[in-house]
């Protein structure tokens, strides 16, 4: 009788501990938020692939990225075409040397429709727009709005908060795959997030 009681008690304790652990485990949303908050910023090289819905590589690219939280980023593409995207937290500049044009937007205006902004800021309300799941170091974000035109957004970030890359999966099945290398943690200098319009360049100001 004592053996049976001990076995039952042990089983009950195991079940209780398992339930307690599961109940207190961080949700995927909380875990992703925690990892993103571990580092104030980083810089890295990136490589890019665009894969068609049929599985063919239709474009490849490379460049550098610099991020400082909250809301500062510099995205410089060096191949196949040179262009630059810079945000100081309020204004966003998109510069294309080839066509000698700078387009200017309010950052909110340009980024409110993309989860890329989650890599650059830590705003609680952002997370309400997505259903988040986790598989290892990969977090998948799916928009909750029924009428959303966004597809899925996947972030690869390790337990130390180092972002390894991200994927954008459109609703039609096209994929944009971005992989980071030579990641350096720490906030880049503030002057990396400012932009001066070069002389002779056409300005397309979309702020309203």
Swiss-Prot record:
A Pfam family (short name) is LolA
Query: Where is it mostly found?
Result: periplasm
Question: Where does the signal sequence lie?
Answer: 1-25
Superkingdom, according to UniProt? Bacteria
Which GO biological process annotations does it have? lipoprotein localization to outer membrane; lipoprotein transport
Q: What does this protein do?
A: Participates in the translocation of lipoproteins from the inner membrane to the outer membrane. Only forms a complex with a lipoprotein if the residue after the N-terminal Cys is not an aspartate (The Asp acts as a targeting signal to indicate that the lipoprotein should stay in the inner membrane).
Write the protein's name.
Answer: Outer-membrane lipoprotein carrier protein
Gene name per UniProt:
lolA
């Amino acid at each position: 009788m004592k053996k049976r009681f001990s076995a039952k008690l042990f089983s009950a304790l195991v079940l209780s501990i398992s339930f307690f652990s599961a109940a207190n485990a961080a949700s995927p949303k909380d875990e992703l938020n925690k990892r993103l908050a571990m580092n104030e910023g980083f810089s890295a090289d990136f490589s890019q692939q665009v894969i068609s819905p049929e599985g063919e590589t239709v474009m490849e690219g490379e460049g550098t990225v610099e991020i400082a939280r909250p809301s500062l980023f510099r995205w410089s593409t060096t191949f196949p075409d040179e262009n630059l995207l810079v945000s100081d937290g309020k204004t966003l500049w998109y510069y294309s040397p080839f066509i000698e044009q700078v387009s200017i937007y309010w950052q909110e205006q340009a980024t409110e429709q993309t989860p890329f902004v989650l890599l650059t800021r830590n705003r609680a309300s952002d997370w309400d727009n997505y259903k988040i799941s986790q598989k290892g170091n990969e977090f998948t974000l799916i928009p909750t709005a029924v009428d959303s035109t966004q597809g899925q957004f996947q972030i690869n970030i390790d337990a130390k908060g180092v972002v390894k890359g991200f994927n954008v999966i459109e609703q039609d099945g096209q994929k944009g795959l971005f992989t980071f290398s030579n990641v350096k943690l720490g906030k880049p200098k503030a002057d990396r997030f400012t932009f001066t319009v070069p002389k002779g360049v056409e300005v397309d100001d979309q702020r309203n």
